Regions:
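A glycine- and Lys/Arg-enriched "phosphate-lid" helix/loop adjacent to the NTP-binding pocket
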Residues: 103-172
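Walker A (P-loop) phosphate-binding loop of P-loop NTPases
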Residues: 15
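Hydrophobic positions on the alpha1 helix immediately C-terminal to the Walker A/P-loop
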Residues: 21
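NTP-dependent small-molecule kinase module
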Residues: 2, 26, 143-217
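Hydrophobic anchor at the beta1->P-loop junction of P-loop NTPases
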Residues: 10
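Pre-Walker A (Motif I) flank of P-loop NTPase domains
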Residues: 3-7
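Conserved lysine of the Walker
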Residues: 18
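ATP-dependent small-molecule kinase phosphotransfer cores
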Residues: 34-127, 200
């Protein structure tokens, strides 16, 4: 956390409802008088959005190696942290980010099976000392997540084309992270209906904001 701002990241596999819940939380925070900035990864800056297209939609992306993928995600994040996130936090804003470094730890480090120490070093280089004050992990059965994602009827990007085994590994990786960092990562049951998930999130964030007001985070 910097200034009076607070940095909240949302994590989870495909179809878990992150985008919907980010919008709902933003609306809730605005009713409390907080200034909110919504970001996504990769993306959030002109450079980041170019990298996003390359990672997800470029015609040559199918040939991308896991190592190149890791470095591109890190490049987008490094730009986002310095160009957008840190300045917003210094202004006292609440930053809501759709994915952050935990996605890289899980997708590239676990599901792509890259060396965990290499992934950690690259993550650290990209973000410096900046970590989310709170990470909301929307946990959902991998097959249910794939079903929900498919039901949206939207074009499928390169990452969403991975097989069931890939997304089972993603979920396991996230749950391991939640056990490793219980003070930062809060597990949210994304199998609940939209209202139920939103209530869990708003309650958790309200508690964190109260803690911030009393100087305990």
């Amino acid at each position: 956390m910097a200034g009076n701002g607070i940095f909240i990241s949302f994590e989870g596999s495909e179809g878990c409802g992150k985008s919907t819940q980010i919008r709902r939380l933003a609306a809730f925070l605005q009713t409390l008088g907080r200034e909110v900035l919504i970001l996504r990864e990769p993306g959030g800056t002109p450079i980041g959005e170019t990298i996003r297209h390359l990672l997800k939609h470029d015609k040559n992306a199918a040939a991308m190696t896991p190592e190149a993928e890791l470095l591109l995600f890190a490049a987008s994040r490094a730009q986002l942290v310095r160009e957008v996130i840190r300045p917003a936090l210094e202004k006292g804003m609440v930053v809501l980010c759709d994915r952050f470094l935990d996605s890289t730890t899980v997708y590239q480090g676990v599901a792509r099976a890259l060396d965990s120490s290499d992934v950690a070093a690259i993550n650290s280089f990209a973000v410096g000392e900046l970590l989310p004050d709170l990470t909301l992990l929307l946990d959902l059965d991998a097959e249910e997540g794939r079903r929900r994602a498919a039901s949206r009827g939207e074009p499928v990007d390169r990452m969403e084309q991975e097989d069931a085994g890939f997304y089972e590994a993603v979920r396991r990786g996230y749950l391991d992270l939640a056990r490793e960092y219980p003070g930062r990562i809060t597990l949210i049951d994304a199998s609940l209906d939209e209202e139920g998930v939103a209530a869990l999130i708003s309650n958790k964030v309200s508690l964190r904001l109260e803690g911030q007001a009393h100087g305990v985070i």
